[in-house]
Amino acid sequence: MEKSESTKIDVVETNKERKGKAPLLGKAPVVAAAVVHAKGGGAKRGIAIFDLILRIAAFASALGAAVAMATTEETLPFFTQFFQFEASYDDLPTFTFFVVAMAIVVAYLVLSVPFSIVCIVRPHAVVPRLLLIIFDTVIIALTTGAAGSSAAIVYLAHNGNQDANWLAICQQFGDFCQRVSGAVVAAFVTVVILIFLVVLSASALRRHH
């Protein structure tokens, strides 16, 4: 039997051919990174758009709460020679604080809209989102304080306090109590929306890392 011999031929690549292939191998990670970056930007832009919508909703509820409380006044149809029975929001310092606090919240939400728009245009920007988180948290504290203190007064107006001999005035001033109750509810709605805004901004910052 004859033995067959095989010949091994080594083909040596030139430097020029190696240089021509090297960029092709290096482009894959770059393209993949660009795709991931684009997907992350799209998600953040969606979060920023939702943030803007929630800010508009919070503005509407805060404005409604401020206007409802500031225009609350009721005068009973009967009066005596010396007294006229009237109830107004500025009779109670707590309700006055409520109006001032909600006016500050409304002004802040208007001023925060440009920052929210910047986050839509530049979804990877960190500083605007960080500022929104900080100031949103401060505004949450202010709104919660105003709504909580006013809710206590509204409760007393509806139920009174027998131990302190505080009478429930809502039986006489029904319209007054309805308006202040609606204002307090709108303020708590604003608090809930602001909490969602902080969660959204924190989620967007987490995606950045």
Curated annotation (Swiss-Prot):
Stretches assigned to the Extracellular side: 68-96, 151-179
Keyword annotations of the record: Cell membrane, Cell wall biogenesis/degradation, Membrane, Transmembrane, Transmembrane helix
Keyword Endoplasmic reticulum in record: no
Chain ranges passing through the membrane: 47-67, 97-117, 130-150, 180-200
Cellular location(s): Cell membrane
A Pfam family recorded for this sequence: CASP_dom
GO BP, sorted A to Z: cell wall modification; cell-cell junction assembly
Chief location of this protein within or outside the cell: membrane
Oligomeric form and interacting partners: Homodimer and heterodimers.
Function description: Regulates membrane-cell wall junctions and localized cell wall deposition. Required for establishment of the Casparian strip membrane domain (CSD) and the subsequent formation of Casparian strips, a cell wall modification of the root endodermis that determines an apoplastic barrier between the intraorganismal apoplasm and the extraorganismal apoplasm and prevents lateral diffusion.
Name under which the protein is recorded: Casparian strip membrane protein 1
Organism: Nicotiana tabacum (Common tobacco)
Upper classification of the organism: Eukaryota, Viridiplantae, Streptophyta, Embryophyta, Tracheophyta
